[in-house]
Amino acid sequence: CPTPDAPQYACCLHGMPTFRESNPNPATRAVSTPNKLFDFKSLGYNYDNLDFHGMDTAHLEAAIKKQKQKDRVFAGFLLHGIKTSADVHLKVCNAADCHEAGVVFVLGARTEMPWHFDRNYKMDITDVLHEMHIPMEALFENDSKIHLEVEIQSVDGAILDSHSLPTPSLIYAPAKGLVSQHIEDHDTETLIRKNVNSLSPSEIKNLRDALVAVQADKSGNGYQKIASYHGMPLSCHYPNGTAFACCQHGMVTFPHWHRLYMKQMEDAMKAKGAKIGIPYWDWTTTFSHLPFLVTEPKNNPFHHGYIDVADTKTTRNPRPQLFDDPEQGDQSFFYRQIAFALEQRDFCDFEIQFEMGHNAIHSWVGGSSPYGMSTLHYTSYDPLFYLHHSNTDRIWAIWQALQKYRGLPYNSANCEINKLKKPMMPFSSDDNPNEVTKAHSTGTKHLNKIQEKDRVFAGFLLRAIGQSADVNFDICRKDGECKFGGTFCVLGGQHEMAWAFDRLFLYDISRTLLQLRLDAHDDFDVKVTIMGIDGKSLPTTLLPPPTILFKPGTGTQLTR
């Protein structure tokens, strides 16, 4: 699949190769191109509901619209692959006074496919600017000293070059008005994915029995083969023969590839007797422990997986911030991340916010474990991966329902169109026994309160850094007082495909600015640190310095 511009990266640029070649599942092989995957119901599954924190589609859209009725500032990041996973620590700076504004986690590995976003990933830094007493007007002054700085740290703790990613920019988003919409009902399908915490004892037993059988299956529909699609052993190859991980992340086809991947595993379990779909773990709600389905140690195939290629078991080493909100907000860290993603009205803008929100679960569940969720190469061997991605896919389905309610496109994308029409490996492979996935292997109250306020975001431009890492950042006043601004996770590995977002990942630093008695008019700094999953600091140059973006609230008047 060579191209004139990047022959060595043909698999990434032209589809999802892992699901096309040597795929024993004809269902996933038949639908292995992204543009066939917008309609998840065509794959034969549905969710028990698409509510978000008790809000149906109509109420969720109303809450989002209210949130957008204020001016906001974002840090805009143009992200791309940096060959490793890393944390990008953002700082908002007013001259030399820098304050932590948040952290972005980039998922990647040395052998990843090249990727980049074609628009900004946005991080809300409105609150950080407020806390730093920086007026919005200051953002537009010719001699403004307001800027963003980042420190990039890989998962092994090494500090990466801060110029590994473009310097984030400040983005101003004015308040939006309200538009009346209608609700459209949807039919349900027989195969239902349920909340993991609502499963009955008989459903738990049924799922465990099915997974035991899949794990014992050594064929192309078995656990080891399907798990290998995501990372090790490497299944995709450049034209020169170099192998790389087939997982697509940091690119527009991330949701499509993983939707098909979930279908592949779900069909394997269904073939072994599963009566319901893979349950979803709704990590946007506050939780203090992992789901019981995966923590019960006895006679439980969901407790861990075995990795034949490494001759070891998967392990988990949860970080404290998984259960204790690092930002100490009113709602959970994950709720805030996904709520902002759902605000987006364009698929390409939604995708980056959505993907980065999902990354933190990988990093904070796996922690420093070399064979766990935080590693791109082995994450898919942990059964918890599939509960996590069932919820990730459900969030995409929620956004699609919102788009239909808004009267906006919900099953198409206008960025990187070429990728949406190319087969995704290994689903499109002639060896894929799953005809469904083969056919779809191409692709064309708290919330209201938040939305009433001005917001400031730190924007990070993310790309592959070759490993997984946590990105943390502080917001600092010019007098030296600093407070934690935020954290996010970069998922990656040595063999990941090259990737880079072409837009900024946005992180809300409004609350931190308020804590520091600052606003958008004040001078402040953003100090970023990046730490790998092994605890080693990474150079901040792995990622460009973040930019600050302001989103004014309802009625905010801004003169330039």
UniProtKB/Swiss-Prot annotation:
Binds 2 copper ions per heterodimer. Transmembrane segments: none annotated. InterPro entries: Di-copper_centre_dom_sf, Haemocyanin_beta-sandwich, Haemocyanin_C_sf, Tyrosinase/Hemocyanin, Tyrosinase_Cu-bd. There is a cross-link at residues 12-14, 247-249 (2'-(S-cysteinyl)-histidine (Cys-His)). Residues 185-560 are annotated as: Unit H. Glycans are attached at residues 142, 240. Its cofactor is Cu(2+). It comes from the Eukaryota. The keyword Signal does not apply. Cu cation B binds at residues 358, 362, 389. Disulfide bonds join 1-11, 93-98, 236-246, 348-415, 476-482. One of its GO terms (molecular function) is oxygen carrier activity. Keywords: Copper, Disulfide bond, Glycoprotein, Metal-binding, Oxygen transport, Repeat, Thioether bond, Transport. Pfam families: Haemocyan_bet_s (PF14830), Tyrosinase (PF00264). Gene3D superfamilies: Di-copper center containing domain from catechol oxidase, Haemocyanin C-terminal domain. Residues 1-184 are annotated as: Unit G. The keyword Mitochondrion does not apply. Belongs to the tyrosinase family. Hemocyanin subfamily. Hemocyanins are copper-containing oxygen carriers occurring freely dissolved in the hemolymph of many mollusks and arthropods. PANTHER family: SHKT DOMAIN-CONTAINING PROTEIN (PTHR11474:SF76), TYROSINASE FAMILY MEMBER (PTHR11474). Decamers of large identical subunits (390 kDa), each containing 8 globular oxygen-binding functional units. This is Hemocyanin, units G and H.
